[in-house]
Amino acid sequence: VLFPFVGSLKDKKFTVDGTDYPMGQHGFARDMEFELVSQTKDEAWFSLKSNDETLAKYPFEFVLEIGYKLSGSEIKVTWRVTNPAKKDLLFSIGGHPAFMCPVAEQGKQSDYYLKLDTDKAITYGLICDGGLLDKDDNLLKVDEDGYCQIDEHMFDKDALIIENRQASKVSLCTPDKKPYLTVSFDAPLFGLWSPAGMGAPFICIEPWYGRCDKTTFDGSLEQREYSNTLQAGEVFRKEYT
């Protein structure tokens, strides 16, 4: 999970009440140990709570809970963020799941297709060398059925950042256009990514509630695009499958 930030920050820092806090890409939750809260044969919940270590680099109290529920061939991932403090909690959150492509070394990645639940060309942004959003008017063309063949140079400039709810369902498809995996979400934006030039046999389909800063951004945490705000006691709950 990417929390409390998605992507990189301008100058690798954020500002709260006039104070600058250094922060690396994607925040810190992915590098911390979560507590197992509950477990059954088909569901597990994990929790991460703010502590002295997190408060020193991110001055907000939080409770982050993540649930995984298996139902047949479907996995539902649920994020629940609670603000236990009296002051507002500002955060971003996103997924970073990776899926095999090609499957079992059958063909090349460029033989496969993406399928989106739209027949309109997708506008996407690209990340510059500093990890920030730069050019955001690129076009990913899909056919009338939503298919787009994966190009071997598709990820040469890092992730494709797709904003404005242009799609809510993305499938990976075999060379004969048969979907073998679908990610469904209600996020305002999502990313598509695979390591550039490494021949990595996977593609990430990432629902996001937040993203990296633009190269032109110059403001405080409250002014960041897609920042989520919880008042005292409020709960943020989202899921994807």
Q: Which positions does each model-derived feature cover?
A:
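Acidic/His-leaning functional-site neighborhoods
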Residues: Y21, H26-S38, E144-E225
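Extended, loop-rich substrate-binding clefts of extracytoplasmic carbohydrate-active enzymes
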Residues: D17-G72
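Acidic-aromatic substrate-binding/catalytic surfaces of carbohydrate-active enzymes
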Residues: V1-T19
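Beta-strand-rich interaction surfaces with strong enrichment in secreted/lumenal proteins
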Residues: E65-G67, E225-L230
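Active-site/ligand-binding surface loops and adjacent short beta/alpha elements
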Residues: D88, A98-F185
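Hydrophobic residues positioned within well-ordered beta-strands of beta-sheet architectures
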Residues: A44-F46, L64-I66, V77, I93-G95, ...
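Acidic, contiguous internal or C-terminal segments within carbohydrate-active enzymes
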Residues: S50-V103
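Short Pro-Gly-centered flexible turn/kink motifs
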Residues: F14-G18, W79, N228-T241
